[in-house]
Amino acid sequence: MSFVVIIPARFSSTRLPGKPLVDINGKPMIVHVLERARESGAERIIVATDHEDVARAVEAAGGEVCMTRADHQSGTERLAEVVEKCGFSDDTVIVNVQGDEPMIPAVIIRQVAENLAQRQVGMATLAVPIHSAEEAFNPNAVKVVLDAEGYALYFSRATIPWDRDRFAKSLETVGDTCLRHLGIYGYRAGFIRRYVSWQPSPLEHIEMLEQLRVLWYGEKIHVAVAKAVPGTGVDTADDLERVRAEMR
């Protein structure tokens, strides 16, 4: 099947300045992400960035760059600018791969594209089971609850669903009901255009989760269990050292 990968790579980062260009074992991080995307079999891969240094690093690795504005409030807004500049048709399948995921398995990039293509829905994503209490109660691990058909009912930083009987006895173990959302999305290009036309929702501001805008406006997001679990993403200097060690 045919799909396009867009990798948003914003240069500024509060916790890790110049994050796309940090060195991981001899290569800029954004180049590692580009290589994972190439392994997925995508028809086209575009790095969307607001900084010339990132563009030069990507082009030196043979990648395609789309320069975007620096004032976007979300990765989806940056994608929308690329969609318009490249003139993608509304039915083009777009996969948003985060620029700080150098260990993302190529198989799940393709999985989310295929998941979307098989359904009459504008957006799809992935999740993995949560097995530890530490992760279940960590607000940085976004949880998702699904309906009987695998569509998202809600995403939250809170522990959902709340296992009343289990947690009344102990908060040290979790059952098999919690899913952690992965930050990879598949969209049809026309859906991205619609998304950015909607006003931000109260829920996305409360939780700081942009996907809640989709549910707020009554649209569906299909969620599949990922075929592979991604490695560590890079948000902090500690994450960076961990990834360097894991990728040696």
From Swiss-Prot:
Domain of life of the organism encoding this protein: Bacteria
A Pfam family recorded for this sequence: CTP_transf_3
Carries keyword Transcription? no
Location (main, coarse): cytoplasm
The UniProt catalytic activity note for this protein reads:
3-deoxy-alpha-D-manno-oct-2-ulosonate + CTP = CMP-3-deoxy-beta-D-manno-octulosonate + diphosphate
Checking InterPro entries in the record gives:
Cytidylyl_trans, KdsB, Nucleotide-diphossugar_trans
Q: Which UniProt keywords apply?
A: Cytoplasm, Lipopolysaccharide biosynthesis, Nucleotidyltransferase, Transferase
Q: What class of enzyme is it?
A: transferase
Tell me its EC number(s), please.
2.7.7.38
Location in the cell: Cytoplasm
- Which pathway does the UniProt entry assign to this protein? Nucleotide-sugar biosynthesis; CMP-3-deoxy-D-manno-octulosonate biosynthesis; CMP-3-deoxy-D-manno-octulosonate from 3-deoxy-D-manno-octulosonate and CTP: step 1/1; Bacterial outer membrane biogenesis; lipopolysaccharide biosynthesis
Among the GO biological process terms of this entry, one is: lipopolysaccharide biosynthetic process
Q: Which Gene3D superfamilies match?
A: Spore Coat Polysaccharide Biosynthesis Protein SpsA, Chain A
Say which family it is in.
Belongs to the KdsB family.
> Main role?
Activates KDO (a required 8-carbon sugar) for incorporation into bacterial lipopolysaccharide in Gram-negative bacteria.
What is the protein name for this chain? 3-deoxy-manno-octulosonate cytidylyltransferase
Q: What is the lineage of its organism?
A: Bacteria, Pseudomonadati, Pseudomonadota, Gammaproteobacteria, Enterobacterales
